[in-house]
């Protein structure tokens, strides 16, 4: 079966934004104009097509990124048909992992900002993640019809707060209730969309007289930005004072794909203005899979290899999301980087080192699907029938094995105990948690050995609320939820040498293991490092991994209060063995004993997770909010002025002090303030707090 759309006409994009910037409405309009969705789904009716989990429809926020395939021929039918695969990403701070996971498989992104509130804390997080994966992006400043909307102010914030070179390719005509359309700064014409047919048709008009000077100044800025793409263009621009429309577009596209500039558009998705032009910009300025560098991976011989976006290359794909569907079971969303995959064929999971067979392949449209015979380089689809695959695994061809770059997932910072309400719920709860953990790598499940309670950990209170909610709805499991627990950690601040000796003689064969370890603090975030410095075979080579294992097991259980130990460098430098009595078990125990003894002498400290908190509040409540943050041991780092008498407070606060903050903040400010928080780092817990925690756990 030949390819239906050439790969040059593919666009794999994500739509990313802050919680209330209007991203889902924007996606809905995209589906409407591309002819897929006949009735526009409004978020405030709970009818949006991409928000297909029930909780999302209730909360009006997007949690899981559904992948949707659509086609676009241009606002004026000026292009040959392009295939646009859209990954809808969540905007809530507890779900940044979903965003990161989607950005990983995209070639470009549309970042939506609210015209009134501009660059918000979460927008900065998403922007940083897009920078990390070098995703070319364009900006859509939405909600231009809202009170306080100001396109140029948002562009300025993108330049100052996000440090991006932002080049507007449009200018709004009017704002707030007078917002009527936009000026295309490349064509230098005004665009007015027809309200009678929900913006399906439009007309080009002359630029309103009062905006001519402004538009010309911005057009000049845009042409200069285009001219900087190459020396030839710059020479032509300096000689002739202008460039052709085609030259401008080609140059802006090249600079966008190189991540040198970010183009900005504006509109109001809700009022059906501007989204059509964003789709044109996606086609004209964002990359096709062949325009971005080939993905890198590691082959069987630990050598770096590349996989180009080519149907004739060996098959390689990345599983970036697992979802449970009530009708077909597990859906594995994959991005195909190279080669071809046919339904019913076998694939090799190079991370798990297992072979699997793909049952069916489906292309998703928000919540319905079409069956496909095959997928090719550049495609995003869902595979049915894969049992062992988890997020981040690579699927490849058995003869050309490769592991594509693994995704790094953050450690969860909050834990709660859950217990089933009845015996019937108990068995179902295990299955439900197992499935949810397979879908979401930032969610962990474990059993507390002492109390045999089931503990679930995640990125924030909302994250765990939704997990508990999904257990109830999707799996019919009723459970009681305990009080949230903070994920404390331990580390050492001093260096020390310690001996671990395990000897047992009780008739017959004994046990003998003896090691000397040097413990020292490692750099923050560097984790555990084991160095083998044994010379002359005083500890035989085959027992060294056992020493390492013993140390790691002791690290999991801590030395002060039973919390895992972070950032320690351990050097095994001496020891001894017995020809008959030494074995792996004995050295494992010796390693564990040596570490425990050394860590207790190496100035051990308790670490607590600290969160980066941003509170947006009306000015008259600022004193109360700051006072409350100080009482919570918060460190105020700075304040910014928002729009219309709003203050934005930046603080670092220990997580243990933030439980129930949402309710307290609401009552202190009559519901007018909002906050966002994300994990920042671990810091030493104050002595009085550390003492109380250690005593409560001993």
Swiss-Prot record:
Spans through the membrane: none
Keywords annotated in UniProt: Cytoplasm, Elongation factor, GTP-binding, Nucleotide-binding, Protein biosynthesis
GO BP terms: ribosome disassembly
A GO term, aspect molecular function: GTP binding
Main location: cytoplasm
Gene3D superfamilies: 3.30.230.10, 3.30.70.240, Elongation Factor G (Translational Gtpase), domain 3 (3.30.70.870), P-loop containing nucleotide triphosphate hydrolases (3.40.50.300), Translation factors (2.40.30.10)
Gene Ontology CC annotation, any one: cytosol
Binding sites annotated in the UniProt record for GTP: 17-24, 88-92, 142-145
Domain (tr-type G): residue spans on this chain: 8-290
PROSITE patterns, alphabetized: G_TR_1, G_TR_2
Localisation: Cytoplasm
Xref: HAMAP family: EF_G_EF_2_B
Entry similarity comment: Belongs to the TRAFAC class translation factor GTPase superfamily. Classic translation factor GTPase family. EF-G/EF-2 subfamily.
Protein name as it appears in the record: Elongation factor G 1
